Amino acid sequence: MTSVALFKQDGSQNGTVELNDSVFSVEANESAEFDAILRQRASLRQGTHAVKNRSAVRGGGKKPWRQKGTGRARQGSIRAPQFRGGGIVFGPTPRSYNYALPRKVRQLAIKSALSQKVANDKFVVVDGLNFDAPKTKEFAGVMNNLKVSERVLVVVTDEDKNAQLSARNLPKTTVVTPAGVNILNVVDAQKIIITQSALSQVEEVLA
């Protein structure tokens, strides 16, 4: 099994921790990562675009001129699509851009991305992130102790409320629980910091 260093909050090493090879030693799969990112970005689209068709445009209830005898083409409404100010034909309507992607593909994408972080030494495991109260300054101190200055993804458990509150106001820092780990935030992060308890939960879900 792959092993990485285990750190304390003060930046000192506290032994090593073994990683599950079925999660953190997976061969890079760019195809799965691409599909998963595409699907997640599509699901984030609001899809609230809309235009007015001829029934939604104000006015146009009266026939503009009589059917016959004027020499002009017959018309039934000045809000028909051929008129300036008329309704739009086949315009965009509100819809969801989300689509299904097999769960195994989504999990493979995350495992592939996590494995690359481990292989590139961008994966830091700490024995815990314990704070007596939410303090952004204290969390920033932990980042300095761990020599982390780049864009970082912090993974903590649901019980680590003070850590979540302490980190969420820091720039270039994203805080999630194991259930919130997804392909976008893993790929976007330049480094991942994860607590030992959160690591166990991630392995339990993905293994």
Curated annotation (Swiss-Prot):
Keyword Ribosomal protein set for record: yes
Region span, Disordered: 52-75
Comp. bias regions, Basic residues: 60-71
Entry coiled-coil feature ranges: none
Keyword set, alphabetical order: Ribonucleoprotein, Ribosomal protein, RNA-binding, rRNA-binding
One term of GO molecular function: structural constituent of ribosome
Taxonomy, superkingdom: Bacteria
GO terms for biological process, alphabetical: translation
GO annotations of cellular component type: ribonucleoprotein complex; ribosome
Protein family according to the UniProt entry: Belongs to the universal ribosomal protein uL4 family.
Family matches, as NCBIfam families: rplD_bact
Function: One of the primary rRNA binding proteins, this protein initially binds near the 5'-end of the 23S rRNA. It is important during the early stages of 50S assembly. It makes multiple contacts with different domains of the 23S rRNA in the assembled 50S subunit and ribosome.
HAMAP family, A to Z: Ribosomal_uL4_B
Subunit (UniProt): Part of the 50S ribosomal subunit.
Record protein name field: Large ribosomal subunit protein uL4
Originating organism: Limosilactobacillus fermentum (strain NBRC 3956 / LMG 18251) (Lactobacillus fermentum)
Gene: rplD
